[in-house]
Amino acid sequence: LHVSGKGLNSPKQRPQLIKVKATMYDLQGKEVWKKAASAHLPSDSTVNCFEALSPDTTKSFMLRLEAVSELNNEILSTNTYFLWSNESSKELASVDIAKVDVNIMHKPTIQVVLTNTSDTPAMMIRLNLCGTDGEQILPVKYSDNYFHLLPGERKTISINWKPFDARGTNPQLKISGYNVKEIVK
């Protein structure tokens, strides 16, 4: 989903009936606007799901767009956008630091559960698997990377990599974000 109100479906995906949810939050994570619609997305298509948004441009907002399958209620896509004018972009610099708890479980893959335990949105969170030498381990496949957590929101990320690629060092997971102090686990 895009901020323009358009949804797209790739040529490889079957046609889908989706629920589209658009929710706008202020920079403190308080919901200020919400809209929902249903749309049919044929394969290899772009469809207008709702009218493009034109928020108050004197303030900054976070816009969360979700596409949910009508068939099984599975979340198909989540996108978060920041909307601001040049004048209001200064508001981002004054956002409080968010606290994110991290729980790592080792299964065949690493499962990381991140929870925003603060009253502030945790913005632009990024995970980075590194060796104890500080160098990035590559290649690594993350189920999601570079995302936002609203207050109280929890997200589970799967991380796949080959131990050989750690160059004989122990892996460390670095979690950082715009307003999240770096965490190393």
Give the positions of each predicted feature.
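Solvent-exposed, conformationally flexible loop/turn segments
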Residues: 42-47, 105-107, 151-154
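Sterically constrained small-residue positions within well-ordered secondary structures
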Residues: 11-13, 54-56, 103, 118, ...
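Terminal connector regions
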Residues: 40, 46-94, 138, 156-185
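C-terminal accessory/binding modules appended to enzymatic or scaffolding proteins
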Residues: 96-147, 157-160
